[in-house]
Design a protein with these regions (language model features):
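Positively charged n-region of N-terminal signal peptides that target proteins for export
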Residues: 1-4
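Hydrophobic helical h-region of N-terminal Sec-dependent signal peptides
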Residues: 6-10
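N-terminal signal peptide c-region/cleavage motif recognized by signal peptidases
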Residues: 12-14
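Secreted/extracellular ectodomain signature
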Residues: 17-136
């Protein structure tokens, strides 16, 4: 039995090493955090293009996903979001935040997908789907 366990571990480790790393980026602090976080994600994918990345936005973190949102230099956020989405990055927005701030979901850019709660989504991804957590 012990030899079987050792053989299983020996052959399972290379398979695990090939699996894509799953990462949840947590945005909740406004446009400056979004600028930094989007740059982090681009760099992340440059180094590890197989990474599975989900951005969860709530509170002030949803603002960069609103149609027409711009960074501090006046550059639109939708362009880097579109580029990252084309690489498989998912953008999830807290429905509670939208309701409490009276933001019409139609104001979100097309890449954004609603989830019932941003905080619950972050917890679910970590606990149930083994995502690692990054907060830029």
């Amino acid at each position: 039995m012990r030899i079987f366990a050792m053989l299983l571990a020996l052959f399972a480790l290379p398979a695990l090493a090939r699996d894509a790393i799953k990462v949840v980026y947590h945005f909740d602090a406004g446009l400056e955090q979004a600028t930094k976080g989007l740059r982090n994600i681009k760099n992340h994918l440059d180094v590890d293009p197989k990474a599975k990345i989900v951005v969860v936005a709530h509170a002030q973190g949803v603002n960069f996903l609103l149609d027409g949102a711009q960074n501090q230099s006046g550059n639109p956020y939708n362009i880097p979001v579109e580029e990252l989405a084309a690489k498989g990055v998912e953008f999830r927005v807290c429905e509670i935040t939208l309701k409490s701030n009276k933001i019409d979901p139609k104001k979100l850019i097309p890449e954004a997908r609603l989830v019932p709660s941003g905080v619950v989504e972050v917890a679910r991804l970590q606990a149930r789907e083994q995502y690692v957590y990054i907060k830029p």
